[in-house]
Design a protein with these regions (language model features):
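Accessory beta-strand-rich segments of carbohydrate-active enzymes
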Residues: 25-28, 33-35, 76-205, 231-232, ...
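Substrate-binding clefts and catalytic carboxylate motifs of secreted carbohydrate-active enzymes
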Residues: 25, 34-35, 44, 177, ...
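Active-site neighborhood of glycoside hydrolase catalytic domains
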Residues: 400-493
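Terminal connector regions
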Residues: 291-295, 716-754, 808-826
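Bacterial Sec-dependent N-terminal signal peptides
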Residues: 1-22
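Extended acidic/polar, glycine-enriched regions
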Residues: 135-139, 226-310
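Active-site-adjacent substrate/metal-binding segments within catalytic domains
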Residues: 60-87, 94-100, 105-111, 118-121, ...
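Intrinsically disordered, low-complexity Pro/Gly/Ser/Thr-rich segments with frequent PxxP/GP/PP motifs
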Residues: 248-267, 688-722, 786-809
Length: 826
């Protein structure tokens, strides 16, 4: 028995020794040092210089107080990280050992046992180096030197005969938002922000495994699995998956081959709100002699098309998913932290779940951030969130020297190969707002460029976004997956064509100071950016302070956590138009959130009513990098602002919406479901005491995937009713499902609200019933560290609602708009 056990253990060990193995070096004891300093300090990998300086109490938390200004010196320094590691017996016996650097930020020299093995210059590239010849069995010293990205960028800028806008950031392939944006601080960091892996193998290595859907119908799917294997010799390898075995001859070097798989009665993958997100999970075993590599591939079966078809006003811009024209509902996503290594799996889950709960089906990954972590895309695959993937270029012009272009090409290859298997990828987009910047932002005059300068800069733009990136996509992706859009938007918001073709970033509201109602007149074919600022939740505001302080709009900390130069001025101007501006800070915070939600609601509903002319609405922005007053609907702590609750309502598959045009109220039902809806619509004009002043009803049929005007209500009907004291209630019931909408005839500041008596009846530890005697407008439920299934809602008399919190309700406070409209309450 002992002899048998010894044989089994020995045989198992032999198999393991011969396999391709990967070891993460994160857990090694890392230290770091500022150039010119003799001290070595403890470091966390993955991480960044800033997080490590905080770890060692060298700098304060830049998210607190006005500390971001106090840590600007960090970006001008050079830094070195080091660790040592031993080889395992298995690694020592392997014929090949490779170091893989998944994320180095940014200008880096890597030394292994004193030998320079890598000179890196791109945060977004994946660097692989064969290191077998440089390794020892024990005490291998890995040292990584980081140069100041700011200083390096400035030196590169000086090599050009002309200046490019945005200074040094455009010369460095790193996250552009680190240099500061109008929603985030300037924190130009450095460090090992993704894992370093030690990969060992002997006779073969699996370099890549991907798939292509060759055929897909209701009866059968044909999928091609594509392998790239690196072999040290001529040999035969066996591939096993789905209880099938295949044999493949390999030659010495790089081998490309494929295997077709038939899937009977395929289950389709659908975006959120359209059906199931079914994912096939294939486990592959690749064997050669005693060596084996395992790899799993998870994918959904679906088709995606981007259609741009000429019509009488311009050209459409819409996505077809599995042959169905799909209305896109979602938001623009920025990195979740200035120091991205701090973003946890829980953070990703919380954000993606909040997006799904808000009825979104797409996220646009904005081009000034990062190509995000694999886990982000995995969650999008699982939850049905389509991804509009920008390449990482934003709001500036980039150089076109050969070194830079080679860097761009390899970055594109690395990231497309990394992300290509994700079912959720719907579109690859070259950049954010650079085409618009060229044509509309007046840089040619501002920067004093000559005709030759301008020609050179435009040619560089064309080379990157109309040649290099699309050619890389062509070389890697099958035609069915190669959907490329060179720049978003295609036409600037000041041009009339921006409303008749392509995608649009409409900033007449906010930047142009146009009223919210302009959203109803300026409806594009696909709205890929628009938005308005609002303050974060009170919990997040308090997190800005290192010590408890009086909350005030004039606080240095509050002012420092608003990065738009005219942010407060703009918010105040719009607030005066629509609300009574509170003097109390808590109430101002509340109303700023209502204002943001109101403006965005007007935009979303105008877009959706215009279906199929408009087929997409992506607001700016989903989330924040730090605690800040911004366009986000989710603040830095992941709390839902009023906007996110409103988005959830405005993105429901069935939406009742009202548009006022002169003296007529046009009532629509938008149906994104893939089935017709039949039922009765009830219309009521109700005063704020709950009395019905006018009623009507109508039987309707709302066809699937349409926007339908069901009624026009003339001002004549409303004669004798004070519109400052009444609202229109619309209720629709179909197949047991109920939908409703309250529409107010006047702006919030003009409503003649009376003080509501709001009653709470506890049901259990996190659930209660809420009711009121008169209209309670925009009811705000505030409980520390809690989120409710609905908030910032209208509570009407003679009705009650059941509200559920995610956590135990501890100290519930309730506000309504009435509290902000009376001097004694402020």
């Amino acid at each position: 028995m002992r002899i048998l056990l010894f044989f089994v253990i020995t045989f198992f060990t032999f198999i393991q020794l011969s396999a391709q193995t990967t070891r993460n070096l994160n857990s090694e004891n890392w230290t770091f040092q500022q150039k010119g300093d003799s001290k070595w300090l403890k470091a966390g990998v993955p991480g960044s210089v800033h997080t490590d300086l905080m770890l060692n109490n060298i700098i304060p938390n830049p998210y607190k107080d006005v500390n971001d200004a106090k840590v600007q010196w960090v970006e001008n320094e050079d830094w070195t990280y080091k660790t040592s590691f031993d080889l395992t017996d298995a690694e020592r016996k392997a014929q090949n050992i490779q170091l893989k650097f998944n994320g180095l930020d940014t200008y880096t020299k890597v030394f292994l046992n004193g030998k320079l093995i890598l000179d890196a210059n791109n945060m977004f590239r994946i660097w692989e180096v064969l290191v077998k010849d440089f390794l020892k069995y024990k005490n291998n010293l890995l040292e990584i030197q980081f140069k100041s990205s700011s200083n390096e960028g400035k030196q590169l800028a000086n090599l050009l005969p002309y200046k490019l806008p945005e200074g040094e950031r455009v010369f460095t392939r790193k996250a552009q938002y680190q240099y500061g944006w109008d929603w985030g601080p300037r924190l130009v960091t450095a460090g090992i922000y993704k894992p370093i892996e030690l990969i060992s193998w002997s006779n073969f290595k699996l370099n890549d495994l991907s798939y292509e859907i060759l055929k897909l119908d209701k009866n059968k799917a044909k999928v091609k699995f594509k392998f790239i294997i690196q072999s040290k010799r001529n040999s035969t390898t066996e591939i096993e998956f789905n209880q099938k075995k295949y044999s493949q001859k390999l030659t010495k070097g790089i081998n490309h081959f494929s295997i077709d798989e038939i899937i009977q009665n395929p289950k389709l993958w659908w975006p959120n709100g359209m059906g199931e997100q079914y994912l096939y999970d294939y486990q592959f075993k690749i064997k050669q002699g005693n060596e084996q590599v395992s790899k799993h591939l998870k994918f959904g079966l679906r088709t995606i098309e981007l259609l741009q078809e000429k019509d009488k006003v311009g050209s459409s811009f819409y996505f077809k998913i599995n042959g169905i024209p799909t209305y896109i509902k979602g938001a623009n996503y920025i990195p979740q932290d200035n120091f991205v290594s701090r973003v946890s799996k829980n953070d990703y889950e919380k954000l993606i779940n909040s997006s799904v709960e808000a009825n979104m089906n797409m996220i646009r990954i904005w081009g000034g951030g990062i190509y995000d972590d694999d886990y982000f895309y995995e969650l999008c695959d699982e939850k049905g969130l389509l991804v509009w993937q920008d390449f990482m270029y934003a709001c500036a012009f980039y150089p076109g020297d050969q070194d830079f272009l080679n860097n761009v090409k390899q970055e594109t290859i690395d990231q497309v190969n990394r992300l290509k298997n994700h079912t959720s990828i719907a579109l690859w987009c070259g950049n954010n707002e650079i085409d618009e910047a060229w044509h509309n932002w007046g840089y040619q005059k501002q920067m004093g460029w000559s005709k030759q300068d301008s020609l050179s800069i435009w040619n560089d733009y064309q080379t990157t976004f109309h040649y290099i990136i699309p050619n890389v996509l062509d070389s890697i992706l099958p035609k069915s997956e190669n959907r490329y859009w060179p720049s978003s938007p295609s036409i600037g918001w000041g041009k009339k064509e921006s409303l008749t073709q392509g995608d649009s970033h409409y900033w007449g509201v906010w930047w142009g100071m146009e009223p919210f109602e302009m959203y109803e007149k300026k409806v594009p074919r696909f709205a890929s950016e628009y938005g308005f600022q609002g303050m974060p939740t009170l919990e997040t505001v308090i997190s800005m302070f290192s010590v408890k302080d009086t909350l005030s709009k004039n606080s240095a900390t509050i002012l420092a956590h608003q990065k738009h130069p005219k942010g407060w001025e703009t918010i105040n101007e719009y607030m005066q138009r629509d609300y009574i501006v509170p003097t109390d800070f808590v109430q101002y915070n509340y109303v700023s959130q209502l204002l943001q939600a109101r403006g965005t609601q007007i935009a979303i509903e105008a877009h959706r009513r215009a279906k199929p002319y408009n087929m997409g609405s992506l607001y700016w922005q989903l989330n924040d990098v730090w605690p800040v007053t911004s366009w986000a609907s989710l603040d830095k702590l992941g709390n839902w602002k009023a906007l996110h609750y409103q988005v959830k309502r405005s993105f429901e598959n069935v939406l009742i919406s009202v548009e006022k045009e002169e003296n007529v109220y046009k009532i629509y039902i938008v149906n994104d479901l893939l089935k017709d809806l039949k039922g009765k619509v009830k219309f009521s004009v109700i005063d704020f005491n709950g009395n019905k002043r006018w009623i009507n009803d109508k039987d309707v049929t709302i066809l699937s995937n349409t926007s339908t005007k069901i009624m026009e209500l003339n001002d004549e009907v409303l004669k004798g009713i004070s519109l400052t004291k009444a609202f229109l209630r619309i209720e629709f019931e179909s197949n047991g499902e109920k939908y409703s909408r309250n529409y107010f005839f006047e702006k919030p500041k003009d409503l003649a609200l009376t003080k509501p008596t709001i009653k709470i009846k506890k049901i259990n530890h996190n659930q209660f019933e809420i009711s009121t005697n008169v209209l309670a407008k925009d009811v705000y439920l505030l409980d520390e560290n809690n989120q409710f299934d609905d908030n910032f809602f209208d509570l009407i008399p003679n009705e009650s609602r059941i509200i559920t919190g995610k956590n135990i309700i501890k100290n519930l406070k309730i506000y309504s708009l009435y509290d902000t409209m009376n001097a004694e309450n402020q």
